[in-house]
């Protein structure tokens, strides 16, 4: 019960590791001899729920996500994560891109960026002109000055179907990358 006095929501980082994780033999200097191991799966979450109950949980399902990881997120009932900054990657520019807000399921949580991402203003300055134009086209916003564009992205995230929206303070304040939380 004490944990619930400290936190309203728990985010499970690297959720995919509960489906499968990459195991590297002890002492190996590289991952060359590693292999995939089956994780505990839904059984672990059911056991925790029976013994502790759940408050609010978010499944961090970013990165390399397989069909079995997607199924585990679905079976758990936890909302997955959507990161708005990922929506405008020119390598995945089709309208089916899972990170474009019109594709968010209701059972998801949208972040403008996470602790590992650039701030919105820093990110927008760092992407290509093509990606900047793709983002402005999606926003239907060709006129807002770049230094204020973070407000349009925040509004976009808040209008999405995601049931929760998390905005880092740096993004609300329109700060640059000198104020980012982490550089992984």
Language-model region placement:
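Active-site and adjacent substrate-binding regions of carbohydrate-active enzymes
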Residues: 1-184
């Amino acid at each position: 019960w004490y944990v619930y006095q400290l936190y309203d929501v728990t985010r499970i980082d690297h959720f995919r590791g509960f489906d499968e994780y990459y195991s590297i033999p002890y002492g190996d200097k590289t991952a060359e001899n590693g292999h995939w191991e089956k994780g505990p799966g839904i059984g672990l979450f059911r056991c925790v729920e029976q013994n502790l109950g759940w408050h609010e949980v978010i499944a961090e399902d970013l990165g390399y996500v397989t069909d079995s990881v997607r199924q585990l997120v679905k079976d758990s009932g936890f909302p997955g994560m959507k990161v708005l900054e990922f929506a405008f990657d020119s390598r995945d520019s089709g309208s089916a891109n899972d990170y474009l807000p019109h594709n968010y399921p209701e059972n998801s949580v949208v972040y403008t960026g996470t602790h590992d991402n650039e701030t919105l203003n820093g990110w927008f300055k760092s992407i290509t002109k093509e990606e900047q134009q793709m983002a402005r086209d999606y926003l239907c916003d060709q006129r807002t000055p770049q230094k204020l564009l973070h407000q349009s992205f925040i509004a976009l995230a808040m209008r999405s179907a995601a049931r929760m929206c998390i905005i880092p303070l740096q993004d609300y304040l329109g700060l640059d990358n000198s104020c980012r939380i982490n550089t992984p």
